[in-house]
Amino acid sequence: MAKLSTDELLEAFKDLTLIELSEFVKKFEETFEVTAAAPPVAVAAAPAAGGAGAAAEDAEQKDSFDIVLESVDASKKIQVIKEVRALTSLGLGEAKALVDGAPSTVLEGANKEAADKAKTQLEGAGGTINLK
């Protein structure tokens, strides 16, 4: 097999969809027994807070979110597919498969503003969204 340069690899990755890239990363991690996750950062322990207050604080402090499409109103499925395509730049077939496979992750690692915007758009189109 010919050795590919970094630039050639990047060009090949540009042609892949987000789903294909995600599958590639998983295979890469398994093959080389590595992880693409950032190393954990030590944080000073905060005093324990009770129940929902702690969950709300965690959500406020969190800086990246996964947008999960939990379910779709059957009568608004087409609008949800259009929004998924607009948010992810997936093709029609991939977006339809993602919507049909709910619950499924639409976006991973989005910042708070992007996550809120995506949630608003998808809920407006007829989807039930959960931010994780």
Swiss-Prot record:
Membrane spanning stretches: none
A GO biological process held by the record: translation
This protein's GO CC annotations: cytosolic large ribosomal subunit
Keyword Ribonucleoprotein among record annotations: yes
The keyword Secreted is assigned to this record: no
Superkingdom of the source species: Bacteria
Region Disordered: start-end pairs: 112-132
CDD domains: Ribosomal_L7_L12
Pfam families: Ribosomal_L12 (PF00542), Ribosomal_L12_N (PF16320)
Family: Belongs to the bacterial ribosomal protein bL12 family.
Protein name listed in UniProt: Large ribosomal subunit protein bL12
Species per Swiss-Prot/TrEMBL record: Leifsonia xyli subsp. xyli (strain CTCB07)
Gene: rplL
